[in-house]
């Protein structure tokens, strides 16, 4: 079974186990109807938890999960990730990509010369950031149009013409 990231638990709210979740999806409204998630530090250690109640406010999902009935249990989930089974995902929009599809892509710099490989997409408050391995070290590049000119799922590359500015 393949699991896909859909949210990140940020922190508890209140004393009864409610958690604040940052959606990592183009479909945050699905948090209102989903009955369960796989919860863990990675897909490999995720366990299923049923949703008792869900709401959306301020760009975040607020969830009560089965078995999480105290602030202490909710605090233990902070930093954990919420996954769904790939078979349950909405169809991808033509002009979009799933985050896991980007990992492992070649990164092309000026002159379309290969400069590295995308290791991970990091979710930051303002926008995503690409962690690129180049010359044996990590380079962080904001995933915004100003720096990322093209993403080709078919060609498996990301074009960052100004990559050298981040070295």
From Swiss-Prot:
Family as reported in the entry's similarity comment = Belongs to the RimM family.
Task: Tell me which residues make up the PRC barrel domain.
Answer: 94-166
Q: What is its main location?
A: cytoplasm
How it assembles, according to the record, is: Binds ribosomal protein uS19.
Task: Provide the domain comment.
Answer: The PRC barrel domain binds ribosomal protein uS19.
- Reading the lineage from the top rank, the first entry is Bacteria
> Per its UniProt record, what PANTHER family does this chain match?
RIBOSOME MATURATION FACTOR RIMM
Q: Which UniProt keywords are present, listed alphabetically?
A: Chaperone, Cytoplasm, Ribosome biogenesis, rRNA processing
Query: HAMAP family per the record?
Result: Ribosome_mat_RimM
Gene for this protein?
rimM
What this chain does, per the record?
An accessory protein needed during the final step in the assembly of 30S ribosomal subunit, possibly for assembly of the head region. Essential for efficient processing of 16S rRNA. May be needed both before and after RbfA during the maturation of 16S rRNA. It has affinity for free ribosomal 30S subunits but not for 70S ribosomes.
Q: Where in the cell is it found?
A: Cytoplasm
Q: Which GO terms describe its molecular function?
A: ribosome binding
A biological process (GO) of this protein is: ribosomal small subunit biogenesis
Q: Which GO terms describe its cellular component?
A: cytoplasm; ribosome
Q: What is this protein called?
A: Ribosome maturation factor RimM
TM segment ranges:
none
Q: Which Pfam families does this chain map to?
A: PRC_RimM, RimM
